[in-house]
């Protein structure tokens, strides 16, 4: 089992016993990251909320900042972006396809964009699809039938003021884990949402999760470092970097 440091925190936090996910990167740069963070990042009683909208310096920069043993988080905004990204990203580079950012002005099912099905290859250790918390079973079916065998549940929960993250995702992640493990036991599920302590990871493991992703807990780097070490050192969970 593997512990991931979710994007965007994986851009900054690197641990020997966890895999950092960098990004999320888009085909073309989307400037204005600092401004959007200041304007929209807020802590609420339901969790952290943001409306950053995939602001980033583009895939070319992202590739320079991502090590071979890390995972490159990417997203398509235009209908040819998957094809354009696939032509740039090395065939052996591990990726996470973010199909569900709720913070864009336009929300489309990017699994219908050309080239989405070209990403699974035998050369990638990780070829993950990060799905929305409200993902329908038909969407999950489609992703698996296209050849993807690693699914991350889930992205932030959309609200009118931006995406919410944290423990509020738990019931959605639980629903997705249960469905995938019932229908497709060969699919590896990465569980995320509210993991702040080792027992949170154990809870997801008991539901059937294969791996874990730590996100907003990373706002406290020392605490997340301790949590990663506790998860890796707990024999009842048995997590280790693979």
Regions found by a protein language model. Give the residues of each.
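Short beta-strand/loop segments at the ligand-binding rim of alpha/beta enzyme cores
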Residues: 1-4, 68-72, 123-135, 180-192
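Glycine-rich phosphate-binding active-site loops on the catalytic face of alpha/beta enzymes
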Residues: 22-28, 94-103, 150-161, 195, ...
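Surface-exposed amphipathic alpha-helices with a cationic face
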Residues: 63-67, 117-124, 144, 177-185, ...
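Hydrophobic alpha-helical segments and helix pairs
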Residues: 82-115
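Alpha/beta catalytic cores of nucleotide-metabolism and tRNA/nucleoside-modifying enzymes
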Residues: 168-190, 196-242
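N-terminal capping/small domains of soluble enzymes
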Residues: 1-80
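Glycine/Thr-rich beta-alpha phosphate-binding loop at enzyme active sites
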Residues: 99-112, 133, 138-187, 218-227
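Catalytic cores of alpha/beta
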Residues: 14, 80-91, 134-146, 178-184, ...
